[in-house]
Amino acid sequence: MTEVVAREVYYCGVCSFPPEYCEFGVSLKRCKDWLQDNNQELFDKIYSDDALATQTSTLSIERQEKISQELAKKQLKEEAKQERELQKKLASKVLIKRIERNRRKHIISISGLEVFNIDMKKLAKTFASKFATGASVTKTADKKEEILVQGDVSDEAKEYIEKLLEEQGLNGVEVEQVDEKKKKKATAPGATPAA
């Protein structure tokens, strides 16, 4: 009987395809750079001049040019898309509102995190366990999600969110704290306020 040996497959750290298939993705240039830094032997096997010449020898010159133009166009589109997403993330801000419920009780509302691909339910659960309070995810009037946390933990929440965004490489994102107080009931004209 022959012994079955598992084949070890090496995956790209950029697009998560095997390096032989990176050319079908949209970030070939970054994939090549990553492969050259992490596995020079495989890079030489796939992208050396000899390897490229043998792969393209069966294609006509016109077809080769067309393929390279399409690939360059795809790469430019993908780079522009990633740049737009990064600018959108950096331009947005996280808003932490401290809302007064009663005289001494507060709720904080955290909104603006949906842009950063953060799982709101997991974050609410983390806040609930970290701050030992109740936390939930609700929808706002404009159909965006926000996290409501009971208690005045806005400073701690701000620190945690800044650390979370920093881990994602988004240091320039603004995290703003706002105090929102309930409006007091207006007394009728001529009536004296109760003491």
Curated annotation (Swiss-Prot):
The keyword Cytoplasm applies. Residues 176-195 are annotated as: Disordered. Pfam families: DENR_N (PF21023), SUI1 (PF01253). Residues 94-165 form the SUI1 domain. One of its GO terms (molecular function) is translation initiation factor activity. It is found in: Cytoplasm. One of its GO terms (cellular component) is cytoplasm. Its main location: cytoplasm. It comes from the Eukaryota. Transmembrane segments: none annotated. InterPro entries: DENR/SUI1_TIF, DENR_C, DENR_eukaryotes, DENR_N, SUI1, SUI1_dom_sf. Keywords: Cytoplasm, Ribonucleoprotein, Ribosomal protein. PROSITE patterns: SUI1. Coiled coil: none annotated. GO terms for biological process: formation of translation preinitiation complex; translation reinitiation. Belongs to the DENR family. Interacts with the 40S ribosomal subunit. The SUI1 domain may be involved in RNA binding. This is Translation machinery-associated protein 22. It comes from Scheffersomyces stipitis (strain ATCC 58785 / CBS 6054 / NBRC 10063 / NRRL Y-11545) (Yeast).
